[in-house]
């Protein structure tokens, strides 16, 4: 199972194209179901087998069975989960089909010799993950539903898709001034070491409750004592409201909470701060702040990050445009 997951982490989604439409007037055999059309994209078919043999879908089903038992697929909840997953993956297969069609239109598909060479290189890179152990590689392929041949075809598709995406985002540029602006607005991301603050808080439901808490603290009552008495955060209440050391760039905390905490000086206690969880009174027990790296030392990294973000935006916009211009028909009844 670990080997299969390792391979699936290397692979994305595969496309295996077949052509046959089963008759809806009779009960379908497994073979007929596999060949039934679940979508058409500009006249090209996506078949049930393409979805059922999709590595990510197979992984989802496997995980569900491990968690909920072998009969999970037969339960009402299981059927709903499977249907939702199939719909999501079908949308991805439709996107891939459009990208492959655009590969022909944009004339970015390499010649067969070059495409095979690139695919073989990727196969060798995957084998290297298994220390070039051919037996283990083949066992993993089998467990994920691939053969050497279908893996190579899948990789050839991915090479074409990558070239289409590169073509669609080739005009994206990031100037030094863009990087400078990002640097100026996100200084805490570029310190010599991560800035941290040791934080305690008291969480209550209403603003009135929070104001009463603040009044008690202003009257010099002990923060930890008040937290143990009134805080509704069960995770920190018994510790006197202590959350511990928090990285300035920690994305696990509410952004409003983080902004308020970072604005406080060491030893300071905030006014009520409203977040999705309620009202907080925040105390900064201590701070560790480090010098900010020079702009020139991080400029290229910032530009690379911003370019990737802009490329993603450009790609998303382009694929939406291509989808709108495509003739797409789905056959939901053939998904189950």
UniProtKB/Swiss-Prot annotation:
Coiled coil: none annotated. It is found in: Cell membrane. A lipid is attached at residue 23 (S-diacylglycerol cysteine). Disulfide bonds: none annotated. Residues 1-22 form the signal peptide. It comes from the Bacteria. It catalyses: [protein]-peptidylproline (omega=180) = [protein]-peptidylproline (omega=0). Pfam families: Rotamase_2, SurA_N_3. GO terms for molecular function: peptidyl-prolyl cis-trans isomerase activity. InterPro entries: Foldase_PrsA, PPIase_dom_sf, PPIase_PpiC, PPIase_PpiC_CS, PrsA_foldase, Trigger_fact/SurA_dom_sf. It is a lipid-anchor. It is an enzyme of class 5 (isomerase). Belongs to the PrsA family. This is Foldase protein PrsA. It comes from Clostridium botulinum (strain 657 / Type Ba4).
């Amino acid at each position: 199972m670990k080997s299969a997951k390792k391979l699936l982490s290397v692979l994305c989604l595969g496309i295996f194209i077949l052509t046959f439409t089963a008759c809806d007037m009779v009960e379908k055999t497994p073979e007929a179901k596999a060949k039934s059309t679940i979508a058409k994209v500009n006249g090209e078919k996506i078949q049930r087998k393409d979805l059922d043999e999709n590595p990510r879908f197979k992984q989802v089903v496997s995980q569900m069975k491990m968690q909920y038992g072998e009969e999970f697929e037969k339960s009402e909840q299981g059927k709903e989960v499977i249907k939702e997953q199939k719909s999501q993956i079908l949308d991805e297969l439709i996107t891939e089909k459009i990208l492959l069609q655009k590969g022909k239109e944009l004339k970015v598909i390499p010649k067969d010799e070059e495409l095979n060479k690139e695919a073989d290189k990727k196969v060798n890179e995957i084998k290297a993950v298994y220390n070039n152990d051919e037996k283990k590689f083949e066992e993993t392929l089998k467990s994920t539903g691939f053969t050497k041949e279908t893996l190579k075809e899948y990789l050839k598709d991915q090479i074409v898709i990558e070239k289409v995406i590169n073509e669609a985002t080739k005009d994206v540029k990031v100037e030094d001034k863009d990087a400078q602006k990002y640097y100026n607005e996100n200084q805490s991301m570029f310190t010599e070491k991560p800035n941290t603050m040791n934080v305690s808080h008291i969480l209550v439901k209403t603003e009135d409750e929070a104001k009463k808490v603040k009044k008690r603290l202003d009257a010099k009552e002990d923060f930890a004592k008040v937290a143990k008495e009134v805080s509704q955060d069960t995770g920190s209440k018994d510790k006197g409201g202590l959350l511990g050391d928090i990285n300035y760039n920690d994305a696990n905390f509410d952004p409003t909470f983080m902004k308020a905490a970072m604005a406080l000086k060491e030893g300071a206690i905030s006014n009520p701060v409203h977040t999705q969880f309620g009202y907080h009174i925040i105390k900064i027990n201590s701070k560790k702040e480090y010098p900010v790296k020079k702009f020139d030392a991080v400029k290229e990294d910032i530009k690379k990050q911003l370019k990737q973000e802009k490329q993603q935006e450009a790609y998303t916009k382009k694929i939406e445009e291509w989808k709108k211009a495509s003739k797409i028909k789905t056959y939901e009844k053939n998904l189950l």
